[in-house]
Amino acid sequence: MITKTSKNAARQKRHARVRAKLSGTAERPRLNVFRSNKHIYAQIIDDVNGVTLASASTLDKDLNVESTGDSAAAAKVGELVAKRASEKGVSDVVFDRGGYLYHGRVKALADAAREAGLKF
């Protein structure tokens, strides 16, 4: 019987392939993106030490958005994570799109983070 593979399982396989080649260091940590149907999350991670340096999501109380699942909310999360990273002294990052296509909410978050001062 032919079964359809889950989109999330395929994304996880793509992410695992990328993560085998991509790692964040203390000098250049990894900007990781996770997208759900309702929310979007971003973390800046130092993989060498296993530490999250900064994070932001649409669940944050200081982020006032009407809708949490659209590109405008993702852009605000990108600005917020870039601001929190600059407070910790992080300016250069490696972008990890998490196996998602670089389009829509993921692209909006990345563009907003770039405009707010992160370099990748």
Curated annotation (Swiss-Prot):
> Matching Pfam families, A to Z?
Ribosomal_L18p (PF00861)
Query: CDD domains this protein is in?
Result: Ribosomal_L18_L5e
Alphabetical keyword list:
Ribonucleoprotein, Ribosomal protein, RNA-binding, rRNA-binding
Q: Does the keyword RNA-binding apply?
A: yes
Q: Which InterPro entries match?
A: Ribosomal_uL18_bac-type, Ribosomal_uL18_bac/euk
One GO BP annotation here? translation
| Disordered, as annotated region | 1-22
Q: What is a GO molecular function of this protein?
A: 5S rRNA binding
**An example Gene Ontology CC term for this record:** cytosolic large ribosomal subunit
Q: Which domain of life is it from?
A: Bacteria
Spell out the subunit comment. Answer: Part of the 50S ribosomal subunit; part of the 5S rRNA/L5/L18/L25 subcomplex. Contacts the 5S and 23S rRNAs.
Q: Which family does it belong to?
A: Belongs to the universal ribosomal protein uL18 family.
Q: Give the protein's function.
A: This is one of the proteins that bind and probably mediate the attachment of the 5S RNA into the large ribosomal subunit, where it forms part of the central protuberance.
Q: What is this protein called?
A: Large ribosomal subunit protein uL18
